[in-house]
Amino acid sequence: EEDYEKAIEYAKKLDEININRKEIEKEMKEQALSMPNINTDGNTCVAYGEDFHEGVIGIVASRLKEMFFRPSIVFAEAETEDKNDGSKKEEHLKGSGRSIPDIHLRDALDYVHKKDLNVMVKFGGHSMAAGLTIHKHKYDDFCRLFEEAVSHFAEGRKFENIKIIDMDLPANDISL
């Protein structure tokens, strides 16, 4: 009986946390879509908000990728780190990215890194998802280079969200 009551209590807490996460995600997505600098006409979608919650940026990147069928990265403020020499603290942005089948996200980030070694602090991932940290003052450079990288790997292809549906279609449902 006591274990059951505890389980119910934990389930309620988890449900509250999940509802809160969904609200944060919705707000962040709406903010990202209303940003004047969000580019959905190019081959990428990159967004950053000072109030974005680091724990939800991956989900928002996934939603943007689904909406625009473009590799998408969302950034949030990262914890400021002290430099070893005691000078001014470094300001960083943490990002989470999601991609589409035609673009290998980690390779695109590697392209950015090779073009300018001073943009990203670190990055990692695979073809469809990646995490990265960039210097905050290099955000615009990152956006430009990421667009260049994805355009390079797209090789002139236009991204189209084609849905493949595997099902039987009865002959009497077809008309000419």
Regions found by a protein language model. Give the residues of each.
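Hydrophobic helix-and-loop "lid/oligomerization" segment in the mid-to-C-terminal part
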Residues: 1-141, 148, 152, 159-174
